[in-house]
Amino acid sequence: MSEVMDYKSRLSDPASRKFETFSYLPAMNAADIRKQVEYLVSKGWNPAIEHTEPEHLMDSYWYMWKLPMFGETDIDRILGEAEACHKANPNNHVRLVGYDNFAQSQGAAMVIYRGKTV
């Protein structure tokens, strides 16, 4: 069995902090984010945009940007709302969530804009 290594992420080092699954991978560019939105839509999940201040990142509650986009399938419209949220809250973390109606849970959640680190 291979040895498990500690990941070098510390609260004292803002650049090393990890948020969710995708934060352990290289940063996604616009094309990668678009593919994730396409996947979310292809699964029939309802997209929503959430944001929070960096100091409240680990809290359970994030602010919802407008309402969930029930039934929205236009990729550009979803990405446009995420960008609008980021422009209105430039220092906040912004994440995209895909709500699965049938499982009554989140099918996906990822930070797509990182806010100012504290």
UniProtKB/Swiss-Prot annotation:
Pfam families: RuBisCO_small. Gene3D superfamilies: Ribulose bisphosphate carboxylase, small subunit. The keyword Repeat does not apply. SMART domains: RuBisCO_small. GO terms for molecular function: ribulose-bisphosphate carboxylase activity. Keywords: Calvin cycle, Carbon dioxide fixation. InterPro entries: RuBisCO_ssu (IPR024681), RuBisCO_ssu_dom (IPR000894), RuBisCO_ssu_sf (IPR036385). Belongs to the RuBisCO small chain family. Heterohexadecamer of 8 large and 8 small subunits. HAMAP family: RuBisCO_S_bact. RuBisCO catalyzes two reactions: the carboxylation of D-ribulose 1,5-bisphosphate, the primary event in carbon dioxide fixation, as well as the oxidative fragmentation of the pentose substrate. Both reactions occur simultaneously and in competition at the same active site. Although the small subunit is not catalytic it is essential for maximal activity. This is Ribulose bisphosphate carboxylase small subunit. It comes from Thiobacillus denitrificans (strain ATCC 25259 / T1).
